[in-house]
């Protein structure tokens, strides 16, 4: 079954993550990690009258009038629908308990018609299944619940009202549609099943409700214990626990109040999203909930990139989420390759995720980020715990040098598209080596080692100015020795053959790529290799602004001729330029870009990866953790430079 690409809303608790569409359908549910495994193939809830012939009306399908909101300052989601054919108003409330492997779903139903209705509610559920890990189902009479189970996981759908009918397999979705389930088999090698409840007679104007609990465990006996405990608690108790948790969540962090409701709501939503995207068990940071399991449009998103995390952890620190930052760097220390570098991307459990090449900027960014966090918290014990990782990474970076150019060896760029020797990656390596040297100095490490790293950083900086600045235009080149066509011969005659690994394999590469790219801001912001007023930085930033601005919808494209997902302006690239303008003292220009990003947020105050180039509406990945991080960084930067009055006209 195909899934929508857009996750309109997310709920969770750091070990469970649920993704919900704008119509309220739960399309993805992860546990015990926020990236794996995903359990939901399909789940629908239907409403019907036993005493009429209207048929079953699916809550999340059809042309219902739908509204959706988060309960203020919580990750509790409410989706309301008007089911006109049944004269019902239904509100679905979804949340995950803060400290239990349980998702709660509550239906409030009101009869808005003039006639009685004998109300029935049916639920059909299909668990993920494959030939390696067969999904099976049973009806557990002890729990009065539908139970799905696989190799290392089981989960139950229990309720606060007794189940009237159930069915295992044999097209349970169709059975709910027909309003009659066949429970003659209570267990089977089938990934799907259904439940049906008799809600009784609902008079005009009357209300009723049904609470569902989706409880997870690694064993059936433990599942039964937990599910029974949850069933004994009322919905009001469960709701109250969750609401208090999220309301208290903000007390330990830095409050930022601008007086602009939309700006402040996005800030609050960003912090709550950060909590959901930070894995409770490991500390890994999820780039985004998955959108494309089938690799039909992209390389997938439900992984941890160290590059994104270096920006995200700075946003954590700006918001006072210091423990989340520290847990990430502890995770990074644990997953570091024995050679000293970090791979392209990881699962939350620390295993290497599907990848296609090292991206050396990520190793530099981790070192930069470790020192950056220390500058916020001044915790020397943190540096001591990180030292072994810092030392291995810095030593790797000074070995990873192209002897002919003096730049870091070819690796993939930050957009993961081109192999080459890139300006952004080079700046990240310089910043990383400088950070490692400073960390060593702070820890009293011998000057010989720290000076070796610092000398290497200075040498690479000289190579950057020599090799990666276009002498004709005075602009940064995006890359040299770069593979513009990964599938065949290069599209230019300005090429050279280079050896790509120690086994002697070689390929042709283009000598220079002069395309403008927002990452060319990187040598100044965030890495500080050059000051904002350095001649090449200033000229490149001006050219980027002129060439990459989207005249129709606003915002900044990633780079010239970007075609990914339609080629739209990105939140990250737009706010990156805003950060540069904050450094340069152009606070009003930065505020203008920030205003654009504020407009791009969804009605649930979530920020996408991109905004449509024609109408500026949020598109593609929602939410993107990196986008929210950049939002925090620009917001804080504007507050520091100009005060909250800068937001008066946003």
Model-identified regions with their sequence ranges:
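C-terminal capping/lid segments that line or modulate ligand- or cofactor-binding pockets
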Residues: 1-50, 301, 312, 347, ...
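Terminal accessory carbohydrate-recognition/targeting modules of carbohydrate-active enzymes
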Residues: 1-262, 318, 640, 644-648
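Conserved oxyanion/phosphate-binding beta-strand-loop segments in alpha/beta enzyme cores
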Residues: 62-76, 256-297
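Aromatic-rich carbohydrate-recognition surfaces in CAZymes
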Residues: 110-111, 301-404, 426, 430-433, ...
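Extended ligand-binding clefts on enzyme/binding-domain cores
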Residues: 158-165, 422-426, 451-572
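Structural helix-adjacent loops and short alpha-helical linkers that scaffold large soluble proteins
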Residues: 255-267, 282, 316-329, 373-391, ...
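Active-site acid/base region of carbohydrate-active enzymes
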Residues: 257-283, 332, 336-341, 354-355, ...
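Acidic/His metal-coordination segments adjacent to aromatic residues that form catalytic metal sites
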Residues: 288-298, 342-358, 403-421, 498-505, ...
